[in-house]
UniProtKB/Swiss-Prot annotation:
Matching SUPFAM superfamilies: BRCT domain, DNA ligase/mRNA capping enzyme, catalytic domain, Nucleic acid-binding proteins, RuvA domain 2-like
Family under the similarity heading: Belongs to the NAD-dependent DNA ligase family. LigA subfamily.
Enzyme class: ligase
Name under which the protein is recorded: DNA ligase
Biological role stated in the UniProt entry: DNA ligase that catalyzes the formation of phosphodiester linkages between 5'-phosphoryl and 3'-hydroxyl groups in double-stranded DNA using NAD as a coenzyme and as the energy source for the reaction. It is essential for DNA replication and repair of damaged DNA.
Disulfide bonds: none
Record-linked PANTHER family: CHROMOSOME TRANSMISSION FIDELITY FACTOR 18 (PTHR23389), DNA LIGASE (PTHR23389:SF9)
Gene3D superfamilies assigned to the protein according to its UniProt record, in alphabetical order: 5' to 3' exonuclease, C-terminal subdomain, 6.20.10.30, BRCT domain, DNA ligase/mRNA capping enzyme, Helix hairpin bin, Nucleic acid-binding proteins
């Protein structure tokens, strides 16, 4: 009801002319509305307005605050952007010490903790939650307004990070409702989500800046910035996990820890959705195992789970020891970082030709498994780490992610440590290893000639969107190569039915059908053939544009980068990939062998303007088409000149909606994009044949 009244009040104020008399209540209403929508988005996970509407209201508030600075509110959402840089952090003495937790490392440790607790207070339930790997923060609200925030520090004295905490969008500047205490201290974890961490390091990599080792370091470094504008750019988040000081002490609070967290949530503070109450010991262990199993899928880093006695009265009875509460414990996951010795480096070649350095390690137990190899990514990463063979290194393994070296221990470097030399020739086929300007990855130039790339290249060549060899699945391709019946794509067209009966579970009838499918695939189109070659970043649409622009393979083979850039939707990077592919003798040999084997396509005639009525238009397909498969519809629209995109935007000219059309249809209707059905599409295609 309060939300409805707020929206109604804002609408009334927005409909009035802005004057010095109406500006202040309008700014108050805008601030209140935007803060409420922030809570709905970050806490309730139930946004009630679009991003564009939110942005419009925010811009309106910023404009008003620029005109009437005397009316700017302390809890205005515009205050999240960061203010003037500080000279240093002030010290804050916590009203109540921020203690650390004891640790349990296995079931025996937790069972002993459970016994100590139950011996004192009897039967207990536990409130269980993920142990976030971030920075502990204390936030003080007075009369519902965020007054100050501090780091844990040594538990007694922390640093004032108020301005930085205000930039975290999930933390309300004013509490929701009115049933909160006059003064309330909220404790929780500030952290950097995995996606934000990856984006931050990607920006650093592009600028050749130092990258953070892990999200915890990134979160801590971001919160301890003297310039809060930097913190504002770091996309930090926050989960509340406890109440601290509450005044007056007589204020009615929930009687269990779980219910107090729900109380915090009702005030607009975010809490983890992974919190669960466990009544039995076996439920606690099941919770631990479940979170551990899903650890790599969670959007944030965790290093264990925290178990707290749920009943607040029991917590008070149990009390504290010197540095930790008796009623809580951190049940830690196996360590994800360990030190070991780098014994050597091997270089592997992937299906796209990427040459990746792989570290050979002295086996070490980390993240629950024994690790003997780790990725070094590329030459830039080797240089950034300053790593050498013989170094002591820090290994990190997170979930199912390939283990990686995140740092070296320089003080342990031996005198006989050796520099890592990146190969100039492919370790598999001997072709030149090249690294294009602006790219971090070095690649084997062998292309289809390179055995390491061959299996994936041939799978791609035979796939439905390429030459579409019916019945030629991945397992058959693997067998053909393993039995040395096929060495290159051209060898597919030398296969006979009798040769293919050598494959597992391949009788003469199946082999004959596959041989017929191979023969039929010889007749294709130039766009399909170009796509089948597997040129980097040349998808179906780009292949079609290349074919339409140059008209023949011969013309494309000798095209310069300048000529390639003239093709629709092709920039300098893709142009370089195409030119580079056709400059390799190995690739030309494969192409010539395919043509000699009988692969052919009809000549392309340049379409007239009348034949391309959709030229310059962007179309999108969604839902199920009953009379035309998606790829055929896409190809026919491209013949008529349309660009077929994968998503709807304001630049979309038409959406073809089949059965069970979903979010794309809704977005098209929202944007006012023209929508037609399958029957209208068929009529359009028939009229332009």
């Amino acid at each position: 009801m309060q939300d409805i009244q707020l929206d109604k009040r804002l609408s009334e104020l927005l409909s009035q002319a802005v004057t010095p008399q109406t500006a202040q209540p309008l700014m108050q209403a805008l601030s209140q509305s935007l803060n409420e929508h922030n809570i709905r988005y970050y806490v309730d996970d139930a946004p009630s307005i679009t991003d564009s509407e939110y942005d419009r209201l925010m811009q309106q508030l910023k404009k008003l605050e620029a005109e009437y600075p005397q009316f700017v509110l302390a809890d205005s959402p515009t205050q999240r952007v960061g203010g003037l840089a500080l000279a240093k952090f002030e010290q804050i003495t916590h009203l109540k010490p921020m203690l650390s937790l004891d640790n349990a490392f296995d079931e025996a440790d937790f069972t002993a903790f459970h016994k100590r607790v139950s011996d004192r207070v009897g039967q207990v339930s536990f409130c269980c939650e993920p142990k976030l790997d971030g920075l502990a923060v204390s936030i003080l609200y007075r009369n519902g307004v965020l007054e100050r925030a501090a780091t844990r520090g040594d538990g007694t004295v922390g640093e004032d990070i108020t301005e930085n905490v205000k930039t975290i969008k999930s933390i309300p500047l004013r509490l929701r409702g009115n049933n909160y205490p006059e003064l309330v201290e909220v404790r929780g974890e500030a952290f950097m989500p995995k996606a934000a961490f990856e984006a931050l390091n990607e920006r650093a990599r592009l600028k050749d800046d130092k990258q953070f080792v892990n999200p915890r370091n990134a979160a801590a470094g971001s919160l301890r910035q003297l310039d809060s504008k930097i913190t504002a750019s770091r996309a930090l988040s926050f989960y509340a996990y406890a109440l601290g000081v509450v005044e007056p002490s007589s204020h009615e609070l929930a009687k269990t820890h779980y219910e107090q967290l729900q109380q915090l949530k009702s005030w607009g503070l975010p809490v983890s959705s992974e919190i669960k109450v466990c009544d039995e010991l076996n439920q606690v262990f099941a919770y631990y195992k479940d979170i551990l199993t899903r650890r790599s899928d969670l959007p944030f880093e965790i290093d264990g789970v925290v178990m707290k006695v749920n009943d607040i009265a029991q917590q008070q009875t149990l009390g504290f020891v010197a540095k930790s509460p008796r009623w809580a414990i951190a049940y830690k996951f196996p360590a994800q970082e360990e030190m070991t010795l780098l014994e050597g480096v091997d270089f592997q070649v992937g299906r796209t030709g990427a040459v990746t350095p792989v570290a050979r390690l002295k086996p070490v137990f980390v993240g629950g498994v024994t690790v003997s190899n780790a990725t070094l990514h590329n030459a830039d990463e080797i240089e950034r780490l300053g790593v050498m063979v013989g170094d002591t290194v820090i290994i990190r393994r997170a979930g199912d992610v390939i283990p990686q070296i995140v740092a070296i221990v320089p003080e342990r470097r031996s005198e006989d440590a050796q520099a890592i030399v990146f190969p100039q020739h492919c370790p598999v086929c001997g072709s030149l290893v090249e690294r294009l300007e602006g790219e971090a990855v070095a690649r084997c130039s062998g292309g289809l000639f390179c055995e390491a790339q061959r299996k994936e290249a041939i799978k791609h060549f035979a796939s439905r969107k390429a030459l579409d060899i019916d019945g030629m699945g991945d397992k058959i391709v693997e067998q053909l190569i393993d039995k040395e019946l096929v060495q290159s794509p051209a060898d597919l067209f030398k296969l006979t039915a009798s040769m293919m009966t050598m494959l597992d579970r391949m009788g003469m009838k199946s082999a004959t059908n596959l041989a017929l499918a191979i023969e039929a695939a010889k007749t294709t189109t130039l766009p399909r053939f170009l796509y089948a070659l597997g040129i980097r970043e040349v998808g179906e649409a780009t292949a079609a544009n290349l074919a339409a622009h140059f008209g023949s393979l011969d013309a494309l083979r000798i095209a310069t980068i300048e000529q390639l850039i003239e093709v629709e939707d092709i920039g300098e990077v893709v142009a370089q990939h195409v030119a580079h592919f056709f400059a390799q003798p190995h690739n030309l040999e494969v192409i010539d062998a395919l043509i000699a084997a009988g692969v052919n396509w009809p000549a392309i005639e340049a379409p007239s303007a009348d034949e391309q009525p959709l030229k310059g238009q962007t179309w999108v397909l969604t839902g199920t088409l009953n009379q035309l498969n998606r790829n055929d519809a896409k190809a026919q629209l491209q013949v008529l000149g349309a660009k077929v995109a994968g998503s709807v935007s304001k630049n979309t000219d038409c959406l073809v909606a089949g059965e069970a059309a979903g979010s794309k249809l809704a977005k098209a209707q929202e944007l006012g994009v023209k929508v037609i059905g399958e029957d209208e599409l068929l009529a359009l295609l028939a009229a332009n044949r």
